[in-house]
Amino acid sequence: KQHQAAPAWVDMVTAFAVSDWDDPAWESKTLAWLDSCFDAGAVGVKVWKNIGMVSRDTAGNLIQIDDPKFDPIFSHIQKRDKVLMGHLAEPKNCWLPLEEMTTNNDRRYYGRHPEYHMYLQPDMPSHEELIGRRDRVLEKNPDLKFVGAHMGSLEYDVDELAKRLDRFPNMAVDLAARMGQVFYQTAENRDKVRNFFIQYQDRILYGTDLADNGERTREQLNQAMEDNWKRDWEFFVTSNTMESSLIDTPFQGLDLPKEVVDKVFYQNAVKWFGLID
């Protein structure tokens, strides 16, 4: 609806269901659905954390992203020159006890939602297993453009993320809902984080994860968007000493070169999603 209301301002990615995973016609129905979405203007496809963590087949097994049944789907997305976005796994904090988590927002969220706190669900896959399965998909599909949502669920260490970006040239990541982890690492080692953004300036997309879920008034939502944008803009373009409710420690802005900031905030989205500039 947003795309229809403002096509010049809003682009969309689509998704597909796995609720009918064991239907013999699942593949053909999914391919037809994706083509209809592409014809309607979708610039990519997003897969969600339900794959690997929630959705199960009729035998009760978790559906995993590296299942061969997905191969023709990912191949088709690549042939149509579209992007696959992946919110796969969760932040590594999800597998840690609350007192060991690195950001206050994760601590609050998993404290309120123990059902999603994997530390309390030892029978569920580990963070390492889910990331390994994602990596196998990228190994099998080297020409597929992939944007890892939420820093590719490697938000806890830019060195680990850099290893994946080196290994998979068609992989990029967005920063949505993971600025707390960026702030935390900046407080620990600003130079390392700053160098990461400069070295991988063509592979990082700004995002917020903010949405209108009906819980806030329009004024509250607008204020939240403005506050987040101003905070993050200050972090990227100045060397100010800053504080954030996301972490307990002060940190210093990265003061990135203008050309890097322009890519992170705008140009990379145009390039990776094939948007009209």
What residue spans do the PLM features occupy?
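H/E-rich (His + Asp/Glu) clusters that bind or coordinate divalent metals
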Residues: 118, 122, 127-136, 141-277
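Active-site gating/metal-coordination segments in enzymes
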Residues: 2-118, 179
